[in-house]
A protein has these predicted regions:
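N-terminal segments that mediate ammonia production and transfer
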Residues: 1-160
Length: 160
């Protein structure tokens, strides 16, 4: 995926490959709870000494999914985080800590729709596109996956 190109459109200045992390974030759709979750996440990010680069709405095609999936579909965003001077191992460890702290903070909040908050992936190495989808639906649901600039060393689809 050419995130550099996508992020330039949003005025997000991404560093070189491997120098930033991408987080896939599932957020509540109702009211302003998505912004509340983002705020919690950003606070924890700062507390852990990490730098937020920006947020991106993940483009999806809701016509590619069934009615049950539509009824429980979260708001899906990507967050970009600068690696700065951390080693890859230090960075990945910090990202893991941020993810766990954010999950706990949202779970302990008073938000009504906190169950929608989920972080499928937060890493400088791996991005997980996940959903209540059949294998044949994932490529058409997530527009990133059908983008001509999308490149991956490995793609794996798991279906229950």
């Amino acid at each position: 995926m050419n995130f550099k190109k996508k992020c330039e459109e949003l005025n997000i200045d991404l560093p070189g490959e491997g120098e930033y992390a991408v987080g896939m974030m599932f957020l509540p759709r109702e009211s302003d709870e998505d912004l509340e979750c983002e705020g919690i996440f950003e606070t924890i990010l700062r507390e852990e000494g990490l730098k937020l680069l920006g947020w991106r709405d993940v483009e999806v095609d809701r016509n590619a999914i069934g009615e049950i999936a539509k009824g429980s579909e979260p708001l899906i965003k990507q967050v970009f985080i600068d690696k700065e001077s951390y080693t890859t191992e230090e960075f990945e460890r910090k990202l893991f800590i941020v993810r766990k702290k954010a999950e706990i903070a949202v779970r302990n909040s008073t938000m009504h729709n906190k169950g929608y908050f989920y972080i499928p992936s937060l890493s400088s190495r791996t991005i997980i596109y996940k959903g209540l989808l059949l294998a044949r639906q994932i490529g058409s649901f997530y527009k990133d996956l059908s983008d001509k600039d999308f490149k991956s060393a490995l793609s794996l689809i798991h279906q229950r």
